[in-house]
């Protein structure tokens, strides 16, 4: 839910009647959603919608999902004033995810609150099965933030904290990352290589095992994987796999990097991301995660964006309660930049999604 910076009331549009709808998803509507999401991200400095939400909308458009998301809009004479997306639970034991945003020029007048109430009511009794993501708080306090106040006002309470950690890159840091990677070796029975199309199913199996208890990553499907590998940002040379010497399908660990396209130049931009690090449960405890993480960091330290600009920072996301990973990343020089929080309906004991 977008939460930062309330516009000056004098800049708000004249009072108008917003029309709520749950429209049929079309290519044109998805393009309008993308433009809306980009406008919100430019204003707030953080995206209100996750990559998975965009992927689920794309899958629904192609009718390649059995659980299409619910998509609600508030429109003002053809302009998207607010959007509410509910990713549908995959089964009776699963929970869904809500992400929503209000256009900057429509904030501060209760439009978002009224629309949010309307959309939640449309979910009916299933509303208690959903979790609300709030992205990009500047610190881990959150208690005074407008987003926290909004969530609690609507009967939600925080249940999960996700850190975005950032490592600025300079000449010394780049050199140190390469040296650290070069100093690591794999066991004699393993080799380092990069992803190919033949790795799809072996990777999905290992990913599911490595993230069996992870709310999002462990649920990735073949369609989800292909959405990502078919994206403009995908670079197979940045997807590292440690597999058995004699059997490529026997994957012991992997690290996937991401360099988003279309980034603006800034102090910490363009940046690359440690997208995901996974270790086969049967291979855990041998330091493979650290070895592959360092290989990915060394790659990003020397990488460029699509325009040939060297990366100026590396970022990643880690759950606050994953103290092992957090300690690893802080030891490598990462610091917490922003905090995402997941909220659940108050008094609900179901697991977070």
Please describe what each predicted stretch is.
Residues 22-24, 30, 34-140, 251-271:
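Conserved donor-binding loop and adjoining core beta-sheet/short helix segment
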Residues 1-14, 91-92, 104-188, 343-345:
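Acyl-donor-binding surface of acyltransferase catalytic domains
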Residues 2-4, 148-176, 294-298, 307-353:
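Active-site/acyl-donor-binding loops of N-acyltransferases
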Residues 102, 277-279, 318:
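Hydrophobic adenine-recognition pocket in adenosine-nucleotide-binding enzymes
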Residues 208-260:
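Phosphate-binding active sites in nucleotide-utilizing proteins
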Residues 203, 250-255, 263-271, 283-287, ...:
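Extended hydrophobic-aromatic, low-complexity segments
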Residues 108-122, 276-279, 285-302, 326-331:
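Conserved acetyl-CoA-binding loop-helix of GNAT-fold acetyltransferases
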Residues 2-60, 179-218:
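Short amphipathic alpha-helix that is part of the acyltransferase structural core
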